[in-house]
Structure formats: C-alpha cells, structure tokens
UniProtKB/Swiss-Prot annotation:
Transmembrane segments: none
Cellular compartments annotated: Secreted
Pfam families membership: Stress-antifung (PF01657)
UniProt family annotation: Belongs to the cysteine-rich repeat secretory protein family.
GO cellular component: extracellular region
Predominant location category: secreted
Protein name per the record: Putative cysteine-rich repeat secretory protein 22
Keyword Repeat part of the UniProt annotation: yes
Key words of the record: Repeat, Secreted, Signal
Keyword Secreted attached: yes
InterPro entries reported for this sequence: CRR_secretory_protein, GNK2, GNK2_sf
Domain called Gnk2-homologous: residue spans: 44-146, 152-276
Domain of life: Eukaryota
C-alpha cells in the first residue's frame, strides 16, 4: 500500500501504517496549500487494494461487469452527487459506489469519478475489491454489496503538521463542539426533509438525503472551519452512529493540530483554520 502520490500532491509525509485483518488505518501529516484549497480538484488522498476479496483476469466476465457499472454510474451522476450500481450474477457481480463531496456536483463529480477509476486500474489492476479517496470523491468497487451498511474496517486519518498556539485544550474542545454541531445539522429533519430515496441503476438508486454539513466557529482572532458527511446510502440514524464513531477518533488523530480529517467509506469529517470548502 503506497501513499507516495499523496505525498507529492498534498506535501504529505507518511508517518506510519498499521494493517491488520480487520483494520486498515493510515496516519499522515498534511501540509495543504491554504490559498488554493478551495480551488483544488481531484486531489488524491489514499487507496486500498482489498486482497481478501480476490482477483480477476483481463477480459473476464467480472471486468466486463465492472466496466458496465462504471459507465452506468457516470451516466447517472446527478446533483445529489451519489450513485450506487451493480451488474452481473455471482460470482462475477460487481458493486460500485460513488460519493462526491457535498459541494462537488455534476462536472466536478464526473471528473473525479474518471480520475479515480483510472487511478484504481493502475494501483489495483487485478483486485476485485478496491477503494480510493480523493478530496472531491470516494469510489468503492467490490464483489460484496455494502449498500446501507456502516464500514468500520477501512478508514484512515490525516492531520496538519502545525500545532495550534495558545490554549490547546480549549481549541480541541471547540473543534469537537463544531463537529458535533455539524453532525446535528447534517442529520436534521430540516436538512433532509423532502429528500426522498429514489430508485438506482438496476432498480434502486438511494441517497437523495443530504447527510452533509459545513460550518464555521469564531475563535477570537481566527475562524475554525468544519465539514461532516455520510454516504447517502446510510439512513439518518446510521449516519448519526457513523459520525459519532468517527468524531470520537479526534483525540487520536488530530489533538492540538491546526487541521485534520478522518475518512472511511461511510462517513468523514474535516476541520481547518482556513476555508477549504464553501460554508
């Protein structure tokens, strides 16, 4: 598993990697360009080749089904920024899930899908199961249907290399408060009212709920910016569970740091002392 591309694009330095049968957790140091953070597109973060889900051969039924799923997802991308599709019969069934960041719709979302799938072909050329994260999207491909399920297995975190100045305990407290406030906003009835689940590729397209929120908090002479998001196949109840679980990782990942994020295939959060997303 390599994070060399993340180092080149994000100015990141890989600190350590811990891999077990059940958990994949990557810890990176980030040094983002604050000035261009709102304009960055398709910035690679991390990928996982899931060896336990087997491999396939070029020209096989699995590859044919994979290509059909990706084409269908690309065609079906809408303003909601989420598509889940499947194609084929076992043992060659392929499931694909694309979740774009809440402010990355249509052209940005489709561009991120194209980049992500191309990169996965090179990084995990034979793996049936593979995941890749970009700043603007997540793409998961698997022979296993994970629709509507919280993924506790595949997650990683990154943090800004700069420590905060002053009262670190107060800063950490304010960061937690902002993220939990955004969790409430992302899962509120007001934020999701009327966003009905509609049929997907092949019969069920889910995820017309928002399950996404951004915000800011004034800290005397500076502002703290935050974002939380769940994939739209989760129910509101499961989104709450997922965000509670992932925000609880804050002390482990990012204590005293000026910025940080934790990402899984089901939910994620990020906070910074500069504006990285439209709020």
């Amino acid at each position: 598993m390599s994070s060399s591309s993340a180092s080149k694009l994000l100015g990141s330095v890989l600190v350590f990697a811990m891999i077990s049968v059940q958990i994949v957790f990557i810890h990176c140091v980030m040094s983002l360009n604050e000035t261009n953070s709102l304009n960055q597109t398709n910035v690679y973060l991390h990928h996982i080749c899931i060896n336990s889900q087997g491999t396939y051969k070029p020209g096989s039924p699995y590859e044919e089904n994979l290509n059909r799923v990706i084409r269908a997802i690309s065609i079906t991308i809408s303003n909601y920024g989420f598509v889940h599709g499947s194609n084929g019969d076992a043992p060659n069934t392929v499931f694909g899930k694309l979740q774009c960041r809440g402010d990355s719709y249509l052209s940005k979302c489709r561009s991120c899908l194209t980049t992500a799938f191309s990169e996965l072909r090179g990084r995990c050329p034979k793996n049936k199961g593979r995941i890749i994260w970009y700043d603007n999207c997540l793409l998961e491909i698997s022979p296993i249907n994970s629709l509507g399920k919280i993924d506790y297995e595949y997650n990683f975190y990154m943090y800004n290399e700069k420590d905060v100045n002053g009262d670190t305990n107060l800063f950490n407290k304010n960061t937690r408060a902002l993220l939990y406030r955004l969790k409430e906003k992302a899962t509120s009835k007001e934020n999701n009212n009327g966003k009905q689940d509609l049929p997907e590729i092949g019969g069920k397209r889910l995820g017309m709920k928002m399950l996404y929120a951004t915000g800011e908090k004034s800290l005397r002479t500076m502002k703290l910016y935050g974002m939380v998001q769940c994939t739209k196949d989760l129910s509101i109840k499961d989104c709450i569970v997922c965000l509670n679980w992932i925000i609880a990782k804050l002390p482990t990942c990012c204590s005293n740091k000026q910025g940080g994020r934790v990402l899984s295939t089901s939910c994620n959060f990020r906070y910074e002392l500069y504006r990285f997303v439209k709020t």
